Each structure stands twice: as structure tokens, then as C-alpha cells.
Curated annotation (Swiss-Prot):
Belongs to the UreF family. Required for maturation of urease via the functional incorporation of the urease nickel metallocenter. Its main location: cytoplasm. It holds the Pfam family UreF. The gene is ureF. InterPro entries: UreF, UreF_sf. PANTHER family: UREASE ACCESSORY PROTEIN F. This is Urease accessory protein UreF. Keywords: Chaperone, Cytoplasm, Nickel insertion.
């Protein structure tokens, strides 16, 4: 069997769990080439404006993004994309993808999530191909990053909860990586922030598992404004 014929995970319980873990760690690793390192989700402007100046401020900002902003929204869209794909409900998947794209608050954030979603799909198609991927993608005008992860995870038989927790961990880790370069923070402080956000990630995952599409919404005006103002920031390292 070649790499491109990887297909769904084997049915044997132990082998399936290990295969799911292997794929999950690969897809959500910083080494998976979707360009996450080049985006800050508006953090660069928040640092420039003085909203984030140390580890405590970064922790508070990210906790709010998780509970009341894009973290929760993206997690909930991943959940709905995974479930729709599992049920082979293409109409529902298309609706989820359309709504997820519409929720993005700024042009640069749209670029960020659409580009990462597109890259995720392309790499999955090339290295981890499976039946149904092309058909599912064809039904969606835009596949943003969380929808892409939910879709591919379901098609490969990766269970929803570990996929969701892995996604949120990867999301937070990327934010912290950006913050550590911008504030800047040392490696130990960065890990302290990641450790402090563990219960917030768990709570966000649990909430998103039970959220309907009507429950999805954000209340992070300052973070959304940062992503808008970053578009005209004079000196910057990141694309968002």
C-alpha cells in the first residue's frame, strides 16, 4: 500500500487508536506545512497598541479569544463539520462551511483561515488521500481551516473529541508562539501560559461539543479590531 492509498484507519481497536493518534499528531504539528507560523490573528497589533506587554496579559487575551472569540467559534465549526461529514450530509456540511467563512471578522483573518484550510486539504489529498474528500470539498465554496480539519478527521475515522482537543491545543500553541516573538517572552514563560490555558481549552472544547450553530458567536471586539487594524500596521512580521 502506498502513502497515497492510506485510506481509512484499520478496524482493529488497538491499531485504529494508534493510527488515529499518528495522523492527529501529524496534521496538527507545527511541522505540517499550512503556514501557521506566519499568522498572529491580530496579536501583532495588540502588542503594538500596548494591550499585550507580558505573559499575564497574553494569557488573559488568549483566554478571552478561546472562550468568547474565534477559539470557541472555530471549535464549534470543527464539531459540526466532523458530524456532517460522518453522516455524509453534504448539504449540512456546505452550510457549515459557508457560515464558518462568514464569521471571520476581517480580510486578513479571512486570508489566514482560508489559506490554511486550502493548504490542509491539498496536503491531506496528496499524502493522506481517502474516499469522499474531493466530493466533500466540491460542495463547499470555501473550506476554512477548522472545517477542513473536521472534514478530513471524519473521513479518516479520527474520533471527534481528541481531534477537537488537538486542534485547540495547536491553535493556542501557535498564538503563544506568535506572542513569544512579539512581546517577547522566554520559553519558560511561554510554557507557563500554555499550562495556564489548559482548563480553558478543556472548557471550550466541552462547550463547543454541545453548541448548536445558533449558539455560535463572539464577543471579542478588541481582538477583532486588532485584526482589522493590523491590515494597515506600518511595520509587521506577520500576515495577520
Amino acid at each position: 500500500m502506498t502513502t497515497n492509498d492510506a485510506g481509512r484507519i484499520p478496524s482493529a481497536a488497538g491499531g485504529a487508536e494508534l493510527a488515529a493518534l499518528y495522523r492527529l499528531l501529524t496534521w496538527l504539528s507545527p511541522a505540517f506545512p499550512i503556514g501557521g507560523f506566519s499568522y498572529s490573528s491580530g496579536l501583532e497589533w495588540a502588542v503594538e497598541a500596548g494591550d499585550i506587554c507580558d505573559a499575564a496579559a497574553l494569557r488573559g487575551w488568549l483566554a478571552t479569544m478561546l472562550t468568547d472569540g474565534s477559539g470557541f467559534c472555530d471549535a464549534a465549526f470543527l464539531v459540526h463539520a466532523h458530524r456532517a461529514t460522518e453522516l455524509d450530509d453534504i448539504k449540512r456540511l456546505s452550510e457549515v462551511a459557508e457560515l464558518a467563512a462568514a464569521f471571520v471578522p476581517s480580510r486578513e483573518r479571512q486570508l489566514e483561515t482560508a489559506a490554511q484550510g486550502r493548504a490542509f486539504i491539498e496536503i491531506a489529498r496528496s499524502a493522506w488521500s481517502c474516499a469522499g474528500l474531493d466530493e466533500a470539498v466540491a460542495q463547499c465554496d470555501v473550506v476554512v481551516y477548522p472545517v477542513a480539519v473536521g472534514m478530513v478527521g471524519a473521513l479518516h475515522g479520527v474520533p471527534l473529541e481528541p481531534l477537537l482537543h488537538g486542534f485547540l491545543h495547536a491553535l493556542v500553541s501557535n498564538w503563544i508562539s506568535a506572542g513569544s516573538r512579539l512581546v517577547p517572552l522566554g520559553q519558560t514563560d511561554s510554557q507557563r501560559v500554555l499550562a495556564a490555558l489548559e482548563p480553558v481549552v478543556v472548557a471550550t472544547a466541552d462547550r463547543s461539543l454541545h453548541a448548536s450553530l445558533d449558539d455560535i458567536g463572539s464577543a471579542t471586539f478588541r481582538a477583532d479590531l486588532a485584526s482589522l487594524r493590523h491590515e494597515t500596521q506600518y511595520t509587521r512580521l506577520f500576515r495577520s
